[in-house]
Amino acid sequence: MPRKGSVPKRDVLPDPIHNSKLVTKLINKIMLDGKRGTAQRILYSAFDLVEQRSGRDALEVFEEAINNIMPVLEVKARRVGGSNYQVPVEVRPERRTTLGLRWLVNYARLRGEKTMEDRLANEILDAANNTGGAVKKREDTHKMAEANKAFAHYRW
C-alpha cells in the first residue's frame, strides 16, 4: 500500500469505433504481451461476426451479454476461530464488470472453434442468450453464495 495517500484511478479512454469504455476494457482483457492492434482486430472481427449471426447491432448484443454475465454476489473466505468460512458478499459495480469481462474472455479462450474471433463471437452470442461457459460461471458463483447464506452474518 502507498504511504503517501491513495493512488488515483486511471481512466480508460473510449475506443475509436464504438466510443465505448466497456469495449476498451474488453480489448485490454483480450490483449496479450501488449499487442493492442491484434486485440482490436480480434474484437472488431468478432463484432462483425456477431452482427452477421444475430442481425442486431454488435454493441447492443455485447452489452446484453455482459449484463447476463456480471455477478451480483460472490463468496469471500473469512477466518473465524480457527476455521475458514465462505462468506457471501455483494460485488461492487466496478468489480462486477471486471469479472464479467474476465470470464467472457477466459471462457472464449477455452472454446473449441478455430480462431479467437469465432470463439469470442460465439461466447458473446451464447452469453446474450443466457447460455455458455461465462453464464454458467456466474450461476455457480451465485449458487455458492446461496449455499453459504448461513454465514452472511460474518460479513465485514
Swiss-Prot record:
Residue ranges of coiled coil: none
InterPro entries xrefs: Ribosomal_uS7, Ribosomal_uS7_bac/org-type, Ribosomal_uS7_CS, Ribosomal_uS7_dom, Ribosomal_uS7_dom_sf
Keyword terms of this UniProt record: Ribonucleoprotein, Ribosomal protein, RNA-binding, rRNA-binding, tRNA-binding
One Gene Ontology MF term: structural constituent of ribosome
Gene Ontology CC terms, in alphabetical order: cytosolic small ribosomal subunit; ribosome
An example Gene Ontology biological process: translation
Recorded family membership: Belongs to the universal ribosomal protein uS7 family.
Role summary: One of the primary rRNA binding proteins, it binds directly to 16S rRNA where it nucleates assembly of the head domain of the 30S subunit. Is located at the subunit interface close to the decoding center, probably blocks exit of the E-site tRNA.
Subunit organization: Part of the 30S ribosomal subunit. Contacts proteins S9 and S11.
Protein name: Small ribosomal subunit protein uS7
Organism: Staphylococcus aureus (strain NCTC 8325 / PS 47)
Gene name, Swiss-Prot/TrEMBL: rpsG
